[in-house]
């Protein structure tokens, strides 16, 4: 039986030392375990949007049994390409509880990404180049830190799937590959559409390169690659019914070079600006180092061409695509990681060992700083969340969160901390997203009005740097529908901005930052009817 030629460029023997420490299974497992450490001791992972997702998960899990949540929200299951973590929460939430389940799932995402990067590097080169270790910190890239957990999970799984695609070709097991990847393509599409599209792009390139290595002409290589990738195509049929009813306004802000530049330099954005920028600069320097001398020899063609096409996709993508914000930003860590993985090793044993040690120390340093940063975020969360002790079940909470300007590198990551009132108290909070076609939750509480019922009505920045759809504090306090809410929760708000209002009764203060007010009402309110035992009745 004829064996298929591998898509792989083996490295010269003298380039790699035998039994190199970074190629052992123990090293790979250590790197995967290391990726979990920053999230190990943070019960609420400090990712900007995550708490908002957790509020949605609470509605998802309990809307059928909670009179509070069913009064404020609607949740209808549908097949959309953005459900990776949602489905895992549906599986694990009833077993572990919502918060432990989310903690476990989110902690696994960087581990999956690191595993995918190492597997792909080994499969594409035959052995793990020492430079590949420099890609590992991108498991904590800005999209993950922002809380795009469905996207991050799906991209990690995509890397593993692509490595498996290459492995099956190398081993000549092409008979079963279409059947396996027919299923894989649907799973990836459901996890996140971007991952499915990226897998298709990389698999097509791999098939073209493989045919060219077999001596086939370009045209034949191209159409054979199309045929090989057809099992990945069926999820495209789901795009029409999924997005068919979306508003045309769901895609906009094309070729915004200002933001694209910000995304490039923010690839490792976390807390300490100088450290994060220097780290990003180092990764870009390593990724582009292959251009200095015979780039056609320094870059492995499958990943090199793949990274180039992802750069083109990044340039062409709008900032908001089909109601999904920051569409272009999400690709930056992936395209940078793939370009780093594309580098073929050069030099002798001593240089390879030196690069591997330097890369490992860099990853350890990034993990250490991230761990300390996450601990600081967690302590700040704990201080503000003390207010929840004074909020009853099913309350209606108007959140106003003090938020730094977008230009500030450091962010408190509290934009959606108020959703913990939904998670722990089944409360209505004005911080959920309205994104038809992108998620399944709907706000069904008309008394809150069109603006003060959803994100970003909770985000309060300085007037000179706020977005046009974000509130001005004084105006929000004056005009939000007071009869629709029971509490005003001013998260991380400095004392000099606390209002003095006859209708606001302070019930908790966080020393210098944060205050919770109970609203004094003068008429019956439209919330759930309370029984004598405090339980809500229908």
Where are each of the predicted segments found?
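Transmembrane catalytic cores of multi-pass membrane glycosyltransferases
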Residues: 42-53, 64-66, 73, 81-82, ...
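Short periplasmic/luminal acceptor-recognition loop of GT-C membrane glycosyltransferases, typified by
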Residues: 377, 387-472, 477-493
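Short hydrophobic/aromatic helix or loop-helix immediately within or flanking a transmembrane segment
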Residues: 55-62, 73-98
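Membrane-embedded helix bundles of polyisoprenyl
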Residues: 31-37, 111-124, 129-169, 177-207, ...
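Hydrophobic/aromatic-rich transmembrane helices and adjacent perimembrane loops
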Residues: 322-349
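Signature aromatic-anchored transmembrane alpha helix within multi-pass, membrane-resident enzymes
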Residues: 283, 341, 345-370
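Hydrophobic alpha-helical transmembrane segments in integral membrane proteins
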Residues: 364-388
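Aromatic/acidic, Gly/Pro-rich catalytic loop(s) in extracytoplasmic/lumenal soluble domains
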Residues: 461-538
């Amino acid at each position: 039986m004829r064996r298929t030629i591998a898509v792989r460029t083996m490295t010269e023997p003298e380039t790699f030392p035998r039994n190199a420490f970074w190629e052992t299974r123990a090293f790979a497992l250590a790197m995967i375990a290391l990726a979990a450490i920053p999230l190990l001791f943070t019960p609420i992972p400090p990712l900007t949007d995550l708490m908002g997702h957790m509020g949605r998960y609470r509605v998802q899990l309990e809307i059928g049994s909670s009179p509070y949540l069913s009064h404020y929200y609607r949740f209808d299951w549908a097949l959309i390409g953005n459900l990776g973590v949602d489905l895992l929460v549906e599986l694990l939430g009833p077993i572990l509880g919502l918060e432990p389940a989310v903690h476990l799932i989110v902690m696994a995402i960087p581990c999956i990404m690191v595993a995918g990067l190492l597997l792909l590097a080994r499969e594409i080169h035959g052995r793990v180049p020492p430079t590949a270790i420099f890609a590992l910190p991108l498991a904590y890239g800005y999209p993950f830190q922002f809380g795009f957990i469905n996207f991050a999970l799906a991209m990690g799984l995509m890397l593993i799937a692509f490595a498996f695609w290459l492995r099956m070709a190398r081993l000549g097991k092409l008979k079963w590959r279409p059947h396996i990847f027919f299923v894989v393509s649907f799973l990836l599409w459901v996890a996140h559409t971007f991952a499915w599209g990226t897998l298709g792009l990389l698999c097509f390139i791999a098939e073209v390169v493989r045919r060219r290595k077999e001596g086939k002409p370009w045209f034949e290589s191209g159409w054979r690659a199309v045929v090989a990738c057809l099992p990945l195509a069926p999820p495209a049929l789901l795009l029409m019914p999924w997005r068919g009813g979306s508003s045309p306004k769901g895609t906009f802000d094309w070729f915004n070079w200002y933001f694209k530049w910000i995304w490039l330099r923010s690839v490792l954005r976390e807390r300490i600006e100088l450290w994060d920028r220097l780290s990003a600069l180092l990764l870009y320097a390593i990724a582009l180092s292959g251009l200095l001398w015979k780039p056609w020899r320094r870059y492995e063609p499958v990943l090199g061409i793949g990274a180039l096409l992802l750069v083109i996709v990044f340039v062409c993508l709008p900032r908001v695509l089909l109601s999904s914000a920051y569409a272009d930003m999400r690709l930056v860590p992936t395209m940078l990681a793939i370009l780093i993985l594309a580098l073929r090793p050069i030099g002798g044993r001593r240089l390879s060992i030196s690069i591997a040690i330097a890369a490992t120390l860099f990853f350890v340093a990034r993990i250490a700083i991230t761990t300390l940063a996450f601990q600081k975020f967690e302590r700040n969360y704990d201080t503000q969340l003390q207010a929840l002790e004074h909020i009853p079940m099913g309350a209606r909470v108007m959140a106003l969160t003090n938020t730094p300007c977008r230009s500030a590198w450091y962010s408190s990551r509290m934009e959606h901390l108020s959703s913990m009132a939904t998670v722990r108290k089944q409360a209505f909070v004005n911080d959920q997203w309205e994104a038809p076609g992108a998620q399944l939750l709907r706000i069904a509480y008309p008394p809150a009005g069109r603006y003060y019922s959803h994100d970003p009505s909770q985000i309060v920045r300085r007037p000179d740097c706020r977005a046009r759809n974000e509130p001005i504090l004084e105006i929000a306090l004056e005009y939000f529908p007071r009869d629709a809410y029971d509490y005003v929760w001013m998260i991380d708000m400095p004392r000099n901005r606390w209002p003095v209002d006859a209708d606001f009764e302070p019930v908790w203060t966080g020393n210098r930052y944060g205050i919770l007010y109970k609203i004094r009402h003068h008429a019956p309110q439209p919330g759930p009817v309370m029984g004598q035992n405090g339980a809500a009745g229908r």
